[in-house]
């Protein structure tokens, strides 16, 4: 049984352990879960809502596929990254989770980066503290002391669902690293940042391996879900490391890519290195071990598929994406000099958090038409992702293969071939 704890819904999937075949899936709710925004820039969700919809999704997928809970041999969990869940000694949720897209702790992270110094932060954390989980917890300490004083443990979203299933509060090294609570040099929780923030390390959950026994379903959780008591939870990872794992991206030189609304490139390195300009994030990958370093380097470009969607909208002809791809393919590579830079969806970290906006260059009214715009937009997206790949290469990652799901921008031969040509990497597409 695989669980995906997303921002919009909870998905449950059944996979045959022998054949790898997906038996069935279900999601809850059928619409979208609410994001609570008490103030501009804030984003919260109630963790108990995740748990309620997890129960519904599990019960639904078992019933719809006529599967008895006793047939489930193991449970794996993928989840939205970076969120902060706080519970008391009774494991009761103390406040809404502060989720990944909440920006209230940005300045706290900036102050820590300046206070500790760039060299110290990057050499130990491989990242700026930024707006990640540790900084969100510091925000709670500064602004909600009455809540902070009651906290017994803090968790990530996937840790919370695992806790509701098993009764055990656990996390992983990969999970701590995505919260910027992992010291890559020392190989332990990041005391330098925790001490700077005045956070007691005892608030952190004990770690378990990403793969392996992490607890078993309690009788109470079994009664709520239809699972069998004693069913083991054996895997958990954040959504981006998990996506890389699903594409068999486990070794140096292998890259996982997505190009939906935003684009993500996630590469694996066997070195403890950082970008001096902090344009990318580094996390402990799912198959890391002390004897075999596997770190995941992640970069995001906000303006990828959303720009293609904008082109589709302004074309105003009820075009399908497949038709746009065909039209784009009628123009030669290079779009006869037309350039489109896809940075129109907010600040881009790979550009030092600047927000240049989308721009069109070299437009000639006598040469360029709709087909040129469609192609130039897709080429611009490919070059934006390659800019990030070059940062990885500067960090010592040798890019050999890019693996992606058959979805979104990768359905376009123009986009896929452009990315392959400029990166020099083979592109392999999979049904995921």
Predicted regions: what is each one?
Residues 80, 214, 346:
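Active-site neighborhoods of enzyme catalytic cores
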């Amino acid at each position: 049984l695989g669980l995906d704890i997303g921002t919009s819904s909870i998905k449950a999937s059944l996979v045959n352990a022998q054949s790898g075949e997906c038996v069935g899936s279900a999601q809850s709710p059928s619409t979208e879960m609410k994001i609570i925004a008490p103030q501009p820039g804030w984003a919260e969700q109630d963790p108990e809502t995740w748990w309620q919809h997890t129960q519904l999704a599990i019960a639904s997928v078992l019933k719809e596929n006529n599967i008895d809970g006793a047939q489930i041999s193991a449970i794996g969990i993928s989840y939205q990254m970076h969120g902060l869940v706080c519970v008391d000694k009774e494991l009761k949720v103390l406040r809404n989770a502060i989720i990944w897209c909440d920006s209230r702790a940005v300045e706290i992270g900036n102050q820590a980066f300046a206070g500790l110094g760039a060299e110290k932060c990057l050499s130990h954390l491989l990242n700026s503290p930024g707006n990640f989980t540790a900084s969100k917890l510091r925000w709670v300490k500064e602004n909600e002391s009455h809540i902070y004083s009651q906290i017994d443990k803090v968790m990530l979203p996937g840790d919370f669902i695992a806790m509701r299933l098993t009764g055990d509060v656990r996390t992983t090294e990969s999970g701590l690293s995505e919260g910027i609570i992992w010291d890559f040099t020392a190989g332990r929780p990041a005391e330098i940042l925790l001490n700077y923030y005045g956070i007691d390390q005892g608030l952190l959950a004990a770690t378990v391996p990403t793969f392996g026994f992490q607890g078993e379903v309690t009788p109470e959780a079994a009664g709520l879900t239809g699972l069998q008591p004693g069913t083991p939870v054996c895997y958990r990872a954040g959504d981006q490391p998990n996506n890389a794992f699903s594409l068999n991206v486990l070794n140096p030189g292998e890259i996982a890519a997505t190009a939906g609304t935003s684009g993500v490139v996630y590469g694996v390195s066997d070195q403890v290195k950082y970008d001096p300009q902090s344009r990318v994030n580094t996390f402990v990958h799912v198959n890391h071990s002390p004897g075999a370093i596997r770190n995941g380097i992640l970069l995001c470009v906000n303006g990828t598929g959303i720009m293609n969607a904008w082109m589709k909208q302004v074309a105003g002809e009820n075009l399908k994406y497949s038709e746009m791809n065909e039209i784009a393919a009628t123009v030669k590579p290079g779009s006869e000099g037309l350039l489109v830079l896809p940075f129109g969806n907010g600040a881009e970290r790979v550009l030092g958090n600047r927000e240049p906006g989308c721009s069109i260059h070299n437009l000639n009214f006598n040469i360029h038409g709709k087909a040129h715009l469609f192609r130039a937009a897709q080429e611009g997206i490919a070059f934006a992702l390659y800019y990030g790949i070059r940062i990885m290469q500067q960090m010592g990652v040798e890019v050999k293969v890019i693996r992606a799901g058959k979805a979104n921008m990768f359905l376009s031969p123009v986009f896929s071939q452009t990315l392959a040509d400029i990166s020099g990497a083979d592109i392999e597409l999979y049904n995921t």
